[in-house]
């Protein structure tokens, strides 16, 4: 077997439709587009969500909610992620160095999710009540 002798299985590939190449092809004249109308024309067609002039669903329904821009720069850190940091002092820079958070994060908060395996000192990060209790139970501490 050689690369130049490889070919797809019989019937696995369909030949492309050759539109407008005579009536014998079955796709001559109108080329499968039907007669007249917007969709038969070059460049014809309607945008996504267009409902023929009727007020579309996305405009009939009310707007709601918003996207907090603060959330783009604040990260949630699980307790289990604290073990990924080298050493026992966890800071924002240490989390970035361990690839737990991305470099564009400006602040972070430790949440109660997972388990703390070792005693760690958390510096300069927000901590929830449950996470604080879990860190202190493991022999760690929180520093502002």
UniProtKB/Swiss-Prot annotation:
GO-annotated molecular function: rRNA binding; structural constituent of ribosome
SUPFAM superfamilies assigned to the protein according to its UniProt record, in alphabetical order: Ribosomal proteins L15p and L18e
Gene Ontology biological-process entries: translation
UniProt cross-references to InterPro entries, sorted A to Z: Ribosomal_uL15 (IPR030878), Ribosomal_uL15/eL18 (IPR021131), Ribosomal_uL15/eL18_sf (IPR036227), Ribosomal_uL15_bac-type (IPR005749), Ribosomal_uL15_CS (IPR001196)
Keywords for the protein's UniProt record, in alphabetical order: Ribonucleoprotein, Ribosomal protein, RNA-binding, rRNA-binding
Cellular component terms (Gene Ontology): cytosolic large ribosomal subunit
Pfam families registered for this protein in UniProt: Ribosomal_L27A (PF00828)
Keyword Ribosomal protein set for record: yes
Biased composition (Gly residues): 21-31
Region (Disordered): 1-53
Entries under NCBIfam families matching the protein: rplO_bact (TIGR01071)
Purpose: Binds to the 23S rRNA.
Quaternary structure (record): Part of the 50S ribosomal subunit.
Family per record: Belongs to the universal ribosomal protein uL15 family.
Entry protein name: Large ribosomal subunit protein uL15
Gene that this polypeptide is encoded by: rplO
């Amino acid at each position: 077997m050689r690369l130049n002798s490889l070919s797809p299985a019989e019937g696995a590939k369909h030949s492309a439709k050759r539109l407008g190449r005579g009536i014998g092809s079955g796709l001559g004249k109108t080329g499968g587009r039907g007669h007249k109308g917007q969709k038969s024309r070059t460049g014809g067609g309607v945008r996504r969500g267009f409902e023929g002039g009727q007020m579309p669903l996305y405009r009939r329904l009310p707007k709601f909610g918003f996207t907090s821009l603060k959330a783009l720069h604040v990260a949630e850190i699980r307790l289990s992620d604290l073990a990924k940091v080298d050493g026992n002092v966890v800071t924002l820079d240490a989390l970035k160095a361990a690839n737990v958070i991305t470099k564009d994060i400006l602040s972070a908060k430790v949440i109660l999710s997972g388990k703390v395996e070792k005693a760690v000192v958390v510096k300069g990060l927000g901590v929830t009540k449950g996470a604080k209790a879990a860190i202190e139970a493991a022999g760690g501490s929180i520093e502002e």
